[in-house]
């Protein structure tokens, strides 16, 4: 199965950027630059306070809306957390879980990533599950072993049907926010190994339905080459998603591959 037959997705991650007042201009310019062909899903994962405004403003350009994290708890005395039910009420369709910054800065564990994945699925929100190796792990030839462990932990207890409603984002930690990017061959090698791991956890048919995104400093200059790889079905975009023109170029490259 190739890119055209799997869901192609470009998911921007605004991180701790943008304000509500900036959203109308962003979505208007994005709409003007988006390709006419609607062969891929385009999503912005925004900070919590921006989700509702982005959902409203994005309706005209068919822009999907996502969150950047979710509580592993459904309700209760958990000050400062946001539940999957609340995200659903805001209109969130996707949610990032296990981002390297959450794992590094907030000590998020594989068990928490698994719990968040399950609670999102229970609320009909698509989890974008982030996995990836550090520079030290790559240098010690541990990339595939470590990433396979992360995938297995995230999907623990999920049925094949549930797994098919998940998205994986491969983000090499050494390429996040550094301007460094894995070569297309390096990215494809790891994404292919992720699909092989899914095949072992479930079966080949299930593995072939799950979209795998590349999330390590993809930009307008390298998107074409990365998206041409057989096991890369889109991108989870950081800094480039803050600029409408750059983001639109990445979307256009994805749509072109998906429509062929």
Predicted regions and their residues:
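Active-site loop-to-helix "anion-binding N-cap" substructures in soluble metabolic enzymes
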Residues: 1-260
